[in-house]
Amino acid sequence: MTSQGSAHARFTRAIQRGNLFAAEMAARELRRLSLEDALAPIVLVSRWEAPRFDRAAVRWHGRLELETQLLTLPESQLALAALATLQGPAAHSGRCVLAEIGRRHRLPLAAALRLRP
């Protein structure tokens, strides 16, 4: 642990500050992020890097499907569509949809999406 705290604490601070580079560096130290934590950098990437966003969003969606028990096909499709909206004018709606899917499956996604629980 450095004087700045654990890698997870640095990751969280970097996300809160919108510092994608610092978040990625801390995430590398962690090696594996929870599904919830892995969503936060995608929200940041959605603002600036379109090609990178697509890859990250599809990868996260795959994890959602694999790690969430009882995810229905309509929920999976809705989650993918909600991820796609993060780069456009409906970004807030997309974040709300993802948070609701998370709530239904007991995943605390609201914080990663910068929404109040």
Which sequence ranges carry the predicted segments?
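Long, low-complexity, acidic Ser/Pro- and Gly-enriched intrinsically disordered regions
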Residues: 1-117
